[in-house]
């Protein structure tokens, strides 16, 4: 039928729901009816319950832009307002306005890991004695949302890196959109592309990638510096914390939201 992918979800121990998206020109109602009959016959022969098959036609839509109508301004922490670049921001006294157009990159401020990192940056830069002269590295910058937040919260200079060229492009666009061109340096790559030692590092990617990077964090973070790490599931936190401690970092706080967590660590 031309199906290029499918998803499955278990309901209890004996039920599974399978979703498949089929290109309409390549499949007809007669084909679907024949598929339903074939599944029924196979189930009866195997002595299994007869599966239910349902289908509906989905009209063509520009999925790359239709999501925008569902994304609204959001307040994060006590100091930030994240606003889609195509909307007028609501009144925001006492908050920094962060305008964002993520494009194809990760990071809109809605995911728990992004929110945890934003709140941690606020604590470090505005609640930890100020951000005057502080430099920050954003590893795996995605849309650039964490770099933007760090700069808006007072960081003197932010170095944003990502291996994805689309993320680099998105970060540069959002940097310029927020008038932060002179304070955020963007490069394609990883830790080796951070040009100088920094006071703090934020990294919101995947736990496995973070584990591989931990031994190298001390090469780019100054003595007495700090880390903000997320993209980590609760069940992965212990392993990440142990790796940090093995590399002379102390986990100062673990913040949780749903199934995700954020580790705040400092150098021993």
Model-derived segments and their meaning:
Residues 1-92:
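N-terminal auxiliary segments of SAM/dcSAM-dependent transferases
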Residues 41-48, 154, 176-181, 223, ...:
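Short helix-capping segments at alpha-helix termini
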Residues 60-130:
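SAM-dependent Rossmann-like transferase core, predominantly class I methyltransferases
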Residues 104, 108-190, 194:
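Conserved SAM/SAH cofactor-binding pocket of Class I
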Residues 166-170, 209, 236:
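Conserved short alpha-helix immediately C-terminal to the canonical SAM/SAH-binding motif I
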Residues 201-202:
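Hydrophobic beta-strand segment of the Class I
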Residues 214-226:
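A short glycine-rich, Lys/Arg-flanked "PGG" loop and its adjoining helix->strand segment in the class I
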Residues 233-268:
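Active-site capping/gating segments
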